[in-house]
Amino acid sequence: HCTSSAASDVYKRQLLSLDTGNALRTQAVPETAASIELTNMFAGLSGELKGENYPPNIPNTIHYTTRDPIGVVCAIVPWNAPLFLTVAKIAPAIVAGNSVVLKTAEQAPFCALLLSEIFQQELPPGVLNVISGLGEECGEPLVTHEKVRKVTFTGSFSVGKIIAKKAAPKLCPVTLELGGKNPNIIMSDADLDIAIQGVIDGMRYTRQGQACTAGSRVYIQEKIYDKVINGVVEKLSKLKMGNALDEGSDIGAIISEEQLKRTLHYMDIAKQTSSAKVLHGG
C-alpha cells in the first residue's frame, strides 16, 4: 500500500524524471510500475518466513529453523534507478523483521525521501531511516558502525571494493551489486530483428546507457557484422532525445555535468583510436 501510494505521488509529480533525467515514458513510468510489483512480491512472501522442523538423520536430535532478523541493515543506492533499487533493498529487509538505514545517492535523493515519508505513516518509529549526503561523510560511518549487521550496496566496482574492506573487520554480511563490462554476443544464426533490438534494449540507450546491467560492447560474427551495425544505427536514428518530461522523448539527460564530461572524454579517446569510427551522433 505504501509503495503504491508513493509511486502514485512520484508519477503525479514526475519526480523520478526530475530526480534522474530519465525519460518519463520509456524509463520513469516502467520503473514506477516495477517498484510496485516488487513490493507486492515481497509482501506476499512475508507469511512464508517462519521456522520449520526437519526429519532428523541423527538419532535423538531435533532439526529446525527459526525466523531470526539480522538487525540493522545499511542500504546504499545509486542514482540511476533510485525508486526501484530503494524498494529492492528496504522491502525484503523489513519483511524479514529488520530495520533499515538507507543512504540515497547525492545526485538523486528525492524519490527515496518521498518513499520514506509515506512509509513513516505505517511503520513503527525507527524501522526505516533515510539520510542523504556524500559517500565519505554518510556512507562510510554507516558501513563501519558497530550496530549495522548487514550492508547492501549497488554502485561502482571501485566503491564496492572499499565498502567490502571497510565492513570486513565486523565480519558482517555484505551484498554488492556492481557495474561491469557486459558484452552482447550475436551469432550468424540469430534472428537479426530480435538481436538488433536486443542491442538497443541491452545497452540501455533509453537510460542514456546508465545502468550496471547495460551492455558495453557487442561481439558480432563477421558474416553478419554489416547488417547488425546498419540495423542498430537505423534504430538509433529513430530514437528521440529530448526533455525527460516530454512524453515523446525516448532518451532523457545524463545525470550530471560531471558524468557528461566523463562520457564525452571516453568518446574523445575512442575518436583518437585509428580503428574506431563514430557511426551515429558524437
PLM ranges: what are they?
Residues G51-I194:
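Rossmann-like NAD(P) dinucleotide-binding subdomain of oxidoreductase/dehydrogenase enzymes
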Residues A28, T32-S35, A112, T263:
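Hydrophobic packing residues in well-ordered alpha-helices of helical domains and bundles
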Residues D9-L15, L49-K50, G242:
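Short, flexible active-site-proximal loops enriched in glycine and acidic residues
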Residues L16, T39, G97, L128, ...:
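Residue-level signal for inorganic ion chemistry
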Residues N22-E31, V130-S132:
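Short loop-beta-helix segment that forms the pyridoxal 5′-phosphate
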Residues H1-A7, Y11:
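Single conserved hydrophobic/aromatic residue that forms the stacking wall/gate
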Residues L123, S158-G282:
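ALDH superfamily catalytic-core signature
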